């Protein structure tokens, strides 16, 4: 089995890099450390890129510090600096070239303000061909609870496949960290109540770790995450095309805005 390829996104205008810290922690916990590709670039939709912003001026020492850290940890890595205007497309292009298995980005935004990500980051989540891990500053070193959010009521085959991906990746994360694994499924009314027995047989889990609750997904998932003190929540966000691709506020985006944990988004 070949090594996993992890693409770690660095914002050079920041002094702290939660995505890098989490990637190093995870790499050292794995039986075989992954190859890591450090993508250094500025998201112009999230940062003031004018000449008046002092954060846009940096010296090569910052990049050297990142490389020194990787060398100190003994991790295999490559690095690139990107000047392209379209951050999201450049990142996806780099991921394709590097044959990325997972992208790790930092989340510096305050979800209480109601705007958690820039348009380019939303586009990344919708269009990435691999899981995207969104890391909050100050995340716990050891993950104790992994929560996977699924939607078993969806009839579309793509959503059923997505549910399977979320469950598989959630179990993988829980095994890696030695954490408890929980599943949450929201439903809107009794006509759409998921069958607990069928769900338990499908995912092969204890009943007390499967949470089926009525309500809006963003409320049900965020409340379950708080009650369980989840360290990471896995959600699905299928790519959209045409007019829908330009719209904000779909279910996964509302869920992300409500959560105050690390999040792994899968397509």
Residue ranges and their predicted role:
Residues 70-78, 179, 203-209:
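A short helix-to-beta-strand connector/capping loop
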Residues 95-142, 225-267:
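Gly/Ser-rich helix-loop-strand patches that form or flank binding pockets
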Residues 81-90, 215-217:
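Charged docking surfaces used in two-component/phosphorelay signaling
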Residues 37-39, 78-82, 133, 182-184, ...:
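General small-molecule cofactor/ligand-binding pocket signal
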Residues 185-235:
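Glycine/small-residue-rich hydrophobic helix-like segments
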Residues 31-33, 74, 99, 178, ...:
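Glycine-centered short loops/turns at secondary-structure junctions
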Residues 1-53, 142-207:
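Small/aliphatic-rich secondary-structure junction motif
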